[in-house]
């Protein structure tokens, strides 16, 4: 099994890149977003790899990060979502945007991907809400912070830090999370708890995405 490839960009097709690793060209299928972000031909790059073996073929799928690879696998756990559809979804939604869409039960976000209709979008939302470990844990954190934390005011810096951690666990970049939480803190005031800060930040990120 191949878990990672590091080499030179040789050429690109509609849905794949040929990666030259020590003179051997590997055909790696990628989302449109990943392909667009690859360096120019002849430049070095590294991709996290998911290897899928069938009776008549072996296919490699490449991702800019391990988080993207895990979402690729998780998306395929939904009935009706194969590798092609999973890549199509990742072509229009970043990991953090997938999480936001699931949390908001946003069918339209998934329906933007080729091959995803209203019924499949609804199935993805229903199944991944329970299957995504990071999502489930973070939503639980949000719920706890919003209820059990009532009446106990945490220091503002601690609440901000906790809210940022929640967003990072949901797949957002730390800098992106910090900006969103800072905006939430400014809007809600210094006494806001981590749960409220994270919830508002998620709303801000969903609107800006």
From Swiss-Prot:
Subcellular location: Cytoplasm
Region (Domain II), start-end ranges: 65-143
Region (Domain I): 1-64
Annotated region (Flexible linker), positions in chain: 144-154
UniProt keyword DNA repair, yes or no: yes
Alphabetized UniProt keyword annotations: Cytoplasm, DNA damage, DNA recombination, DNA repair, DNA-binding
Domain of life: Bacteria
Record has Disulfide bond as a keyword: no
Pfam families reported in the protein's UniProt record: HHH_5, RuvA_N
InterPro entries (UniProt xref): DNA_helicase_Holl-junc_RuvA_I (IPR013849), NA-bd_OB-fold (IPR012340), RuvA (IPR000085), RuvA_2-like (IPR010994), RuvA_C_sf (IPR036267)
Gene Ontology biological process: DNA recombination; DNA repair
GO cellular component terms, semicolon-separated: cytoplasm; Holliday junction resolvase complex
Residue segments, region Domain III: 155-209
GO molecular function: ATP binding; four-way junction DNA binding; four-way junction helicase activity
Self-association and partners: Homotetramer. Forms an RuvA(8)-RuvB(12)-Holliday junction (HJ) complex. HJ DNA is sandwiched between 2 RuvA tetramers; dsDNA enters through RuvA and exits via RuvB. An RuvB hexamer assembles on each DNA strand where it exits the tetramer. Each RuvB hexamer is contacted by two RuvA subunits (via domain III) on 2 adjacent RuvB subunits; this complex drives branch migration. In the full resolvosome a probable DNA-RuvA(4)-RuvB(12)-RuvC(2) complex forms which resolves the HJ.
UniProt function note: The RuvA-RuvB-RuvC complex processes Holliday junction (HJ) DNA during genetic recombination and DNA repair, while the RuvA-RuvB complex plays an important role in the rescue of blocked DNA replication forks via replication fork reversal (RFR). RuvA specifically binds to HJ cruciform DNA, conferring on it an open structure. The RuvB hexamer acts as an ATP-dependent pump, pulling dsDNA into and through the RuvAB complex. HJ branch migration allows RuvC to scan DNA until it finds its consensus sequence, where it cleaves and resolves the cruciform DNA.
Family assignment from sequence similarity: Belongs to the RuvA family.
Domain comment in the entry: Has three domains with a flexible linker between the domains II and III and assumes an 'L' shape. Domain III is highly mobile and contacts RuvB.
Protein's UniProt name: Holliday junction branch migration complex subunit RuvA
Designated gene of the protein: ruvA
């Amino acid at each position: 099994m191949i878990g990672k490839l590091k080499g030179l960009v040789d050429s690109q097709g509609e849905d794949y890149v040929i990666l030259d690793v020590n003179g051997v060209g590997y055909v790696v299928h990628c989302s449109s977003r990943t392909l667009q972000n690859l360096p120019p031909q002849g430049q070095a790059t590294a991709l996290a790899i998911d290897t899928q073996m069938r009776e008549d073929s072996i296919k490699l799928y490449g991702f800019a990060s391990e988080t993207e690879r895990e979402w690729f696998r998780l998306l395929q756990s939904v009935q009706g979502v194969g590798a092609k559809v999973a890549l199509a979804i990742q072509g229009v939604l970043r990991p953090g945007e997938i999480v936001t869409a699931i949390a908001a039960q946003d069918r339209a976000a998934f329906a933007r991907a080729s091959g995803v209709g209203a019924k499949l979008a609804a199935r993805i939302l229903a199944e991944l809400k329970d299957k995504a470990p990071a999502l489930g844990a973070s939503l639980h954190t949000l719920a706890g912070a919003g209820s059990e934390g009532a009446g106990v005011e945490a220091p503002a810096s601690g609440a901000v830090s906790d809210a940022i951690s929640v967003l990072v666990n949901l797949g957002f970049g730390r800098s992106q999370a910090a900006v969103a939480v800072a905006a939430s803190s400014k809007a809600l005031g210094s006494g806001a708890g981590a749960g409220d800060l994270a919830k508002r930040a998620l709303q801000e990120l969903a609107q800006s995405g």
